[in-house]
Structures are given as C-alpha cells and as structure tokens.
Amino acid sequence: MFTGIVQGIGQIISLSEVNTVTTVEIKLPNVANLAIGASVSINGVCLTVVRIDSDIVQFDIINETMERTNLGDLTIGDSVNIERSLKFGDEVGGHILSGHIFGTGIISAKTRSGDQMSLSIIAPPSIRKYLTEKGYIAIDGISPTVGQVDNGVFDLHIIPETMRLTTLDAKDIGDVVNIEVDSNTQLIVETIERLLKERGVE
C-alpha cells in the first residue's frame, strides 16, 4: 500500500524489452533498507524490485501495464514519482493507494496563479462516475484533492511543495497521467449502483 505522498523523483536510466517483459532501471533518491521483492510506486504504479545496484534499481513490467499506464511512454532520462510502500506505524499523509491504475487521463489545461498551479485533466469515461468535488484521487502516484468536475474534466490545484517534490510542475498540455480512484469512493458508487439495479432503478 501507498499514501500518495511522493518521497522523491527518480530518473530512468535504461529500458529494454525481452519476451514481452520490459526491464527498467531507475536511479532512486533513497535506497536505504530497500530489498529485492519490495514494492515501490513508480508514477503511481506498484512495481516489484528485482535487482539493486547502488542507487540503481531494476523493475520488470509486463506488456499490459505498459499499455494501460504512462509507463509505456517513458524514455531514458525521464523523471518519475517515487514512493516506497507503507510500513506499519507510518503516517498516512494522503490517502491509501493500491498502486493499481484505473486508467489514464490527458492534461487539457495548465495555469499558474502566484505560486499555485492548476491542472485540468480529461478523465476516461470508465472512471468519471467516481469523480466528486473535494474527493480523493491519485495522479501519477500523487494524492491531490479533486477540484471542480465538469463533463468528465476535473481540476487540480497544486501547492508549491507538491510542485517541488513531484513531476507535476514539468507536465504540459497533452501529457498523459496515471489515475487511481479512491477505493472507498469506488465501493460506495458500485454498491449504490448494485442496489438500484436490484430494485429495478436504472
């Protein structure tokens, strides 16, 4: 599990594909006590450590993950958001995340007002029913609060500290971002849908 509080930015060192599995090497900002088999969130995607060489950590990614997330768009030199898995007793500063991506969105607008940045993101149809103003969402592993929601487009208002610690400040219009829906929101929406269907209400 993760919390959506990014702990640093990693850099893609190498990418190679063999037999439908892509191996990626990432330079991590902190590898203290990191072990093979550990889970790490890379742009919100839960990946398993398969090799550690100093601060260069290797992960294997299957084709489905590459196709369903923005990891398939990565090239050498790109930056990614990093979060180590949650441990018992750790503070949950954002909200609980699984690292399982529901879909990808596209940035449709980016504006600045003083030190604050705002993004508008077009959500895929499959997750639009889970979007609520002031609700939880994860974008590339980051846990911001949803702003206004209008016809499948939702706004995020990003504080300076988040801009400094994550890759969001470097994002531009047209960029693809990974989206994970809050599990509690998903459960509530799908339970209500099921109950209404059982009662014959569409």
Question: What kind of region is each of these model predictions?
Answer:
Residues 1-202:
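Conserved loop->alpha-helix
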